[in-house]
């Protein structure tokens, strides 16, 4: 038990470091931050509008092409949304009925 009598009890201390107390951090005032944020949001909206005007360097043909692409995509979406799933399944079954039976597997007979 004599070996355990030499154990240091208490907090560890670092050599060469003066004892410094725990310092509390200063709290930031939120009112000033909120005011700055509101100002920044107002200016950022204005900047975004200006950037949009400056960044639109597409040719008229490119703008027309993208406009037509969006229009066609909307038409496709409306066309798909107009039918219910049940109607689509019925149309698909009608289409399969009209196909030739070329791809059907012929009957396999063991006798012939």
UniProtKB/Swiss-Prot annotation:
Regions of compositional bias (Basic and acidic residues) in chain numbering: 45-56
Cited InterPro entries: FAM32A
Query: Which Gene Ontology BP annotations are present?
Result: apoptotic process
One Pfam entry for this protein is FAM32A
Q: Where is this region: Disordered?
A: 23-56
Organism superkingdom: Eukaryota
Segments forming a coiled coil: none
Q: Which residues form the signal peptide?
A: none
The main place the protein resides is nucleus
| Transmembrane region(s) | none
Instruction: Tell me the compartments it is located in.
Output: Nucleus
List UniProt keywords, sorted A-Z. Apoptosis, Cell cycle, Nucleus
Tell me, in a sentence or two, what this protein's role is.
Answer: May induce G2 arrest and apoptosis. May also increase cell sensitivity to apoptotic stimuli.
Give the record's family classification: Belongs to the FAM32 family.
> What name goes with this protein?
Protein FAM32A
Native species of this protein?
Rattus norvegicus
